[in-house]
Amino acid sequence: MPYVTVKMLEGRTDEQKRNLVEKVTEAVKETTGASEEKIVVFIEEMRKDHYAVAGKRLSDME
């Protein structure tokens, strides 16, 4: 049973997340041969103040 975790900054619409889950599921199905019913996709959304690059939070870089 494939498990896929997508980590991204918050702010996407439900429609964007729905499309993402559908496309990731299809890619895993085509690549691994796993049945759609066995593929699990997690979306973890992060706030910009909980994510940093080069020692700086993204919320501080705006």
Curated annotation (Swiss-Prot):
Catalyzed reaction equations: (2Z,4E)-2-hydroxyhexa-2,4-dienedioate = (3E)-2-oxohex-3-enedioate
Cited InterPro entries: 4-OT, 4-OT-like_dom, Tautomerase/MIF_sf
Active site: 2
MF terms (GO), sorted A to Z: isomerase activity
Family statement drawn from the similarity comment of this UniProt entry: Belongs to the 4-oxalocrotonate tautomerase family.
Subunit structure: Homohexamer.
Name this polypeptide is given: 2-hydroxymuconate tautomerase
Lineage start: Bacteria, Bacillati, Bacillota, Bacilli, Bacillales
